[in-house]
A protein has these predicted regions:
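Protein kinase-like catalytic core scaffold
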Residues: 19-22
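Solvent-exposed, flexible loop/coil residues
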Residues: 16, 36-40, 86-89
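Short beta-strand micro-motifs enriched in acidic
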Residues: 11-15
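Peripheral (often C-terminal) accessory segments that flank ATP-dependent C-N-forming ligase machineries
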Residues: 49-148
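A generic structural signal for alpha->beta connector loops
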Residues: 2, 17, 93-95
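Active-site "cap" helix and flanking loop/linker of ATP-utilizing ligase/carboxylase catalytic domains
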Residues: 1-7, 24-79
């Protein structure tokens, strides 16, 4: 337990008392360690492996973020068969750093009820917080998930 990445999840009870729900030797969910690598250049995953095998780790420290970052969890609004993901060309060129689609055309998809209904992710980068907030609020203006 000396050197690693740990996921610690807590909850505040209705009585105001904090409770530890989980402590596990893993990075947080939704690609958090990868998002930190994009934003800061610090690779927690490689360094966790290095530490696990007794190798020296690279410089791990709090670094300023380069830009404003978001991860969008892709999901369907309806049950059906996935047709395609359409992203506005200009938006794609300007902001999409990585697209990871987990389904292919005609795969069965379900309306989003939980993490197991996700169909992929987008990693986005912006020049300002205002751009980021607007893009996340107006996703239907630059992205469409087509399902039949």
């Amino acid at each position: 337990m000396r050197t690693s990445i740990y996921n610690i999840e807590t909850r505040i009870g209705i009585n105001g008392t904090p409770y530890i729900m989980e402590v596990s030797p893993r990075g947080g969910g939704n690609r958090l360690a990868e998002m930190l690598r994009f934003a800061t250049g610090v690779d927690l995953i490689i360094n966790a492996v290095r530490a696990a095998v007794g190798d020296d780790v690279d410089d791990i420290r709090q670094k300023p973020y380069s830009g404003y970052w978001a991860e969008v969890i892709l999901h369907s609004d309806t049950d059906g068969y996935f047709k395609n993901l359409v992203i506005d060309d200009e938006f794609y060129r300007s902001h999409v750093v990585q697209k990871d689609l987990w389904v292919k055309e005609n795969d069965r998809v379900s309306v989003f009820k939980g993490a197991n209904d996700a169909i992929g992710t987008l990693v986005l980068k912006f020049e300002s917080e205002k751009q980021l907030v607007e893009a996340l609020r107006e996703q239907n203006c630059w992205m469409k998930i087509n399902v039949e």
